[in-house]
């Protein structure tokens, strides 16, 4: 197994730098079910942020990318169930992907709700806005 940093994953996804994109694509194509590429939760969160801020991708587009990565047999995503729940909510709910990841982890951990002062994060149906 190998691990990928955000910049390698982004180069693979956007193919905007020919040399780096070729290297990233080659590396990922060499991955397999027996020798997978591993992506951390942090890489997933940072990748979404980069796709939003630097490449102006919409939440729906990014959610589709995330589901494609989740379905790839040669890629293992840390806490994949959190990423799947967050990707689904992110595509439709309006809060930041990182907020959805926080809520997904809290749900998985058995929390009853997650309290926040962040109005956007409170859009998640699991979150409770602390001060109105």
What are the residue ranges of the model-derived segments?
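Residues that scaffold the ATP/ADP-binding catalytic core of kinase and kinase-like folds
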Residues: 11-13, 50, 124-125
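Short, mixed-charge aromatic SLiMs
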Residues: 33, 67-76, 126
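Short, well-structured N-terminal submotif of metal-dependent ribonuclease cores
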Residues: 1-39, 54-61, 67, 119, ...
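Amphipathic alpha-helical segments within well-ordered protein domains
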Residues: 48-49, 87
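Alpha-helix capping/helix-boundary segments
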Residues: 8, 43, 82, 101-102, ...
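Acidic, PIN/NYN-like endoribonuclease modules and their adjacent C-terminal/linker elements
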Residues: 1, 103-132
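Active-site neighborhoods of divalent-metal-dependent phosphate/nucleic-acid chemistry enzymes
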Residues: 74-117
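Short glycine/serine- and small hydrophobic-enriched flexible loop segments
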Residues: 49-53, 107
């Amino acid at each position: 197994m190998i691990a990928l940093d955000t910049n390698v994953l982004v180069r693979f996804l956007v193919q905007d730098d020919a040399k780096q994109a070729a290297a990233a694509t080659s590396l990922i194509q060499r991955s397999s079910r027996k020798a997978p590429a591993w992506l951390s939760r942090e890489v997933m969160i940072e990748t979404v942020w980069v796709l939003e801020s630097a490449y102006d991708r919409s939440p729906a587009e990014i959610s589709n990318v995330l589901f494609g990565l989740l379905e790839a047999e040669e890629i293992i995503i840390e806490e994949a169930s959190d990423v799947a729940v967050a990707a689904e909510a992110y595509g439709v709910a309006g809060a930041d992907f990182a907020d959805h990841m926080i809520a997904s982890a809290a749900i998985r951990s058995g929390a009853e709700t997650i309290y926040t002062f962040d109005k956007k994060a409170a859009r998640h149906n699991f979150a409770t806005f602390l001060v109105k």
